[in-house]
């Protein structure tokens, strides 16, 4: 079986010994994990869902199986970015009220090992999640959203862990559309935290600056601990 969430390609296999992890890394995966004996997760970031669909098309005979693919030993090329408008500093606010903690405490290696990028995590205490920066909605899903700022920096907000399992179960509601321009503090998503907890899933919410969009900029986290929604948490400069 092949599935995907907003960050990972999720594959169920019969024989784990036949999985070529190096090939997955050469194809652009930032990391490969084995959460269970017959599960393989490959961190392809926001490309995971597209790759899942391409694999399923091959399985269903809609696309030919390529047998002469040459794997690169270098990193995958980042998607084309719009022309950047340079600013000295970019402030990232808390998308929700709660407790700001290090990504190292997130029980998902995608975030705890900074495979997609750097940032912070927040244990939410409210159901409403707002845009942490101004920009364009470049990714929107039940449990996550991405915003690209005018200088090309991309921020991913991922509400909860493994919450892709709650898709179409009345837990999440998006208030924006792909391509929409939003201001900082605009309501983007609501989540029923009680339902997430009732399903024995973690509500911790990583807020990540994607590596490919960061370039040579530096990240400074200004505040940990209890914060209000819209508090200034992170500076990019």
Language-model-detected regions and their locations in the chain:
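A generic local secondary-structure boundary/capping motif
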Residues: 89-90, 111, 193-197, 222-224
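Short peripheral tails and domain-boundary helices/loops at the edges of structured domains
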Residues: 170-171, 205-229
């Amino acid at each position: 079986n092949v599935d995907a969430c907003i960050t990972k390609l999720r594959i169920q296999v019969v024989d784990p010994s036949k999985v070529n992890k190096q090939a997955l890394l050469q194809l652009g995966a930032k990391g490969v994990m084995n959460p269970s004996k017959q599960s393989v997760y490959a961190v392809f970031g926001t490309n995971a869902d597209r790759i899942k669909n391409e694999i399923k098309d091959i399985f269903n005979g809609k696309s030919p199986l390529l047998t002469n693919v040459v794997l690169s030993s270098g990193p995958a090329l980042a998607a084309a970015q719009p022309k950047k408008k340079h600013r000295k500093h970019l402030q990232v606010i808390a998308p929700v009220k709660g407790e700001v903690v290090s990504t190292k405490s997130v029980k998902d290696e995608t975030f705890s090992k900074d495979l997609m990028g750097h940032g912070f995590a927040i244990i939410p205490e409210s159901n409403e999640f707002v845009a942490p920066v101004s920009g364009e909605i470049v990714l929107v899903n039940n449990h996550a959203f991405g915003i690209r700022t005018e200088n090309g920096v991309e921020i991913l907000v991922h509400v909860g862990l493994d919450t892709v399992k709650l898709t179409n179960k009345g837990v999440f509601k998006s208030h924006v559309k792909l391509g929409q321009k939003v201001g900082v503090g605009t309501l983007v998503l609501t989540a029923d935290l009680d339902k997430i907890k009732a399903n024995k899933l973690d509500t911790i919410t990583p807020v990540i600056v994607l590596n490919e969009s960061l370039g040579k900029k530096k990240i400074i986290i200004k505040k940990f601990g209890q914060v209000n929604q819209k508090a200034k948490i992170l500076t990019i400069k």
